[in-house]
């Protein structure tokens, strides 16, 4: 995957480049994230990458084979992010956060909190009451599908990797997608975990709608002064 290289700037001026990648396979984007992280300097601006992936299951570093129940024809990729197995597919907003956490003076826990808070604030604008859990990263809502099911449902998953003091990977927010592939895994390693999406809760109906709000929320929380958007050709 070829990306335009931004002009570097003094590290004292927090800058953010937001790349709109459209729909892409997982592997080339992952390879590009690793290459970007390995080649960046102390003056390289941080980047957010907005993407929808072709259907894929990704295993995190803590992933266990028994949580892949019946992947079938959906490919499985062993990733280097934190966490366990999840599903990516069209209609899901994936936001990769390539942040120099040392320069931003953020701990990893603080960055995770920023991701969760940005999602919660975005959902609140649509009247969705969501929350984070200290023992299970991600964003959840009380399950409205009936008492016979789980008492809560997961809307968003998180997984990060830190290399050279910089983050890559990020978050996945279910927006308006086919949810059945989640039934073929134990999402994030939890058997029977209920999954839901914003379109089923009266929230954003499209990835474009969701990402505009979420990017703005997260950029504000981290404290960027200048934000530049660019669309990348596939």
From Swiss-Prot:
Its main location: cytoplasm. One of its GO terms (cellular component) is cytoplasm. Substrate binds at residues 81-88, 157-159, 170-172. The active site is at residue 188. It is found in: Cytoplasm. Its EC number is 2.3.1.181. The record marks 154 as: Lowers pKa of active site Cys. InterPro entries: aa-tRNA-synth_II/BPL/LPL, BPL_LPL_catalytic, Octanoyltransferase, Octanoyltransferase_CS. One of its GO terms (biological process) is protein modification process. Keywords: Acyltransferase, Cytoplasm, Transferase. Pfam families: LplA-B_cat. The keyword Acyltransferase applies. Residues 42-226 form the BPL/LPL catalytic domain. Transmembrane segments: none annotated. One of its GO terms (molecular function) is lipoyl(octanoyl) transferase activity. It catalyses: octanoyl-[ACP] + L-lysyl-[protein] = N(6)-octanoyl-L-lysyl-[protein] + holo-[ACP] + H(+). In the reaction, the free carboxyl group of octanoic acid is attached via an amide linkage to the epsilon-amino group of a specific lysine residue of lipoyl domains of lipoate-dependent enzymes. Catalyzes the transfer of endogenously produced octanoic acid from octanoyl-acyl-carrier-protein onto the lipoyl domains of lipoate-dependent enzymes. Lipoyl-ACP can also act as a substrate although octanoyl-ACP is likely to be the physiological substrate. This is Octanoyltransferase. The gene is lipB.
